[in-house]
Every structure is written in C-alpha cells, then in structure tokens.
C-alpha cells in the first residue's frame, strides 16, 4: 500500500531530525578536514556544500529571505537546469568560506532544525518554489535535504575510514517523497535540460524493496512515472532502495552488487537501462 503524503511528511521529518544529529556528530569527530571526500571536494568543502543545501532548502521551505552571502546563488538557483546546479554549488561554497567542521556542524544543524520548526504546522503537500523554479511539495524539499545529508555523510565517513549507513526505509522515503514527485513536477522536463536528439521511449519497471512497483518512461520529452501494466517494459530492475540510490549517484559500481544478486536486471532490452540512468538525475 502506497503511503499517503501525510505519512511521508511525518516520516521524513523524523528521519531528517535523526539524520542531522548523526551528520553533525560525524562532522564534530572529523580528524582530517582536508581529506578528499568526493570529486575534488575535501571533507570541509563537502560539509560547506551541505550547509548550502540546508540554507537554500530551508529558505525555499519557509518562504523567507536567504542570508546575504547566499543571495546571489539563491537568485541564480531559481533559473537553472539540472546541468547548471554545479554553478550554484560553486558560488555558494565560494561565498561562505567557513571550513571548520565543528562550526559547520552547528550551522547545518541549526538550519535543519529551523526548517523543521518553521514547517511544523504544514502537512507537506504545500507547493513551494525550488531549484529551476520547479514547484515541489514541501515534503520533497525536506526529502532532498535528507538525501544530501545521507549521501554526503557517507562521503565524509568513507574519507575517514568509517561508515555512515543509509537505511532501507530512509531510501524509500527519498524515492517516494523526493525523486518521484520531482520527475512528475510541472516543467520537470525543462529542469532536466536540453535533449537535442529524439529518442525512443525507455520503459523500466522499478521494483525497490519495501516500495510499490513503478514504471519509469523516459523519452525526448523527459521522464514520467506510471503504474505498472500500461505498456510493454524494456527492462526490469529489482534492488534495495539504498543501494539503488547510491548507484544513481555513482557512489558505487553496478558490477559487484549485480554479481552478488543485490541488483537484478532483466527484460527484453536490458541494455537500455544505461540510457535511462543518464536521464533520471537528481541534484
């Protein structure tokens, strides 16, 4: 049975509160803030980016004005496509030079707690402006914040030789509370960027453990989410949602989980999954 928006709302709020505590504790215990965490970012840079996410998402969620140092990036964020989000990230990280992990832990926790406080009277279905001017349910903005804390918490922990696990239930909330609403939002195709080449639809049935089955249909107009049974499927994917989220963010390779049976792919055109994953992107 698919969870109602109010159920997602309460569960995401609880998970976000727990995760920001865990993330802040991790940051306060960092031994080498200059260690490489992801791409060219150090642990300190990654934490500064998470602060940016907390600031921008709390601003969108509450309808308040951003802090002055984030004003330019906030205005830019309203106009970008997904391929231009990296420019927003770069501006934010440059505009806010704090790199002390303990200080960043406090700033991130303060912002997430403020977001939870200011949205306590909402039910999660309210539409708010987000990246690229998309209108998303409030639940999805908090869901994106949860995703960033979990994915980048894992980046930071791995740089220190530690673990920062993502629970199956948390990943389920991210898929159902953030990704699927993002893909079905008005003008989601525009936010997804230019697709110059026409393409045949890629139809994928996604079977995530603990989630209802959904069908993702990608073509030159974007990606939509459908109920199963409406059209022939090219490729079926079965996986744990936490593992699938890390695959989609290129945090783990597909070969190992596939050989271990943690990810199963089958169907009449399984090779088309690669094209779908190129199109199903989340900031």
Where are these regions (language model features)?
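C-terminal interaction segments
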Residues: 229-283
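Acidic/His-leaning functional-site neighborhoods
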Residues: 211-236, 240
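Short, helix-capping/interhelical loops that line the mouth of catalytic, cofactor-
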Residues: 1-9, 56-120
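Acidic interhelical loop/turn segments
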Residues: 24-36, 112-142
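A glycine-rich beta-turn/hairpin centered on an aromatic-Pro dipeptide
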Residues: 175-219
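Short, contiguous alpha-helical
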Residues: 32-77, 131-189
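Structural signal for well-ordered, non-membrane alpha-helices
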Residues: 20, 24, 28, 54-58, ...
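An N-terminal domain-cap segment
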Residues: 2-48, 57
């Amino acid at each position: 049975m698919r969870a109602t928006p109010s159920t997602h709302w309460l569960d995401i709020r609880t998970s976000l509160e727990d995760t920001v505590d865990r993330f802040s504790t991790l940051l306060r215990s960092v031994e080498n803030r200059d260690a490489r965490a992801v791409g060219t970012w150090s642990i300190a840079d990654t934490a500064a980016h998470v602060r940016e996410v907390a600031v921008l998402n709390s601003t969108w969620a509450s309808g308040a004005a951003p802090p002055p140092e984030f004003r330019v990036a906030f205005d830019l964020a309203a106009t970008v496509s997904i391929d231009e989000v990296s420019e927003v990230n770069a501006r934010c990280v440059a505009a806010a030079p704090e790199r002390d992990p303990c200080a960043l832990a406090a700033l991130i926790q303060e912002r997430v707690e403020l977001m939870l406080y200011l949205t306590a009277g909402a039910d999660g279905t309210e539409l708010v402006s987000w990246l690229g001017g998309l209108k998303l349910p409030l639940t999805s903005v908090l869901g994106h914040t949860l995703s960033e804390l979990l994915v980048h918490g894992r980046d930071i922990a791995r740089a220190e030789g530690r673990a920062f696990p993502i629970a199956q239930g948390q990943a389920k909330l991210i898929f159902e509370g953030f990704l699927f609403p993002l893909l079905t939002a008005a003008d989601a195709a525009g936010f997804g960027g230019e697709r110059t080449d026409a393409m045949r639809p890629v139809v994928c049935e996604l079977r995530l453990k603990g989630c209802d089955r959904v069908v993702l249909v990608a073509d030159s107009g974007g990606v939509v989410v459908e109920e199963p049974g409406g059209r022939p499927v090219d490729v079926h994917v079965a996986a744990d949602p936490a593992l699938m989220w890390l695959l989609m963010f290129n945090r783990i390779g597909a070969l190992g989980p596939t050989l271990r049976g943690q990810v199963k792919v089958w169907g009449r055109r399984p090779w088309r999954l690669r094209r779908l994953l190129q199109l199903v992107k989340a900031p």
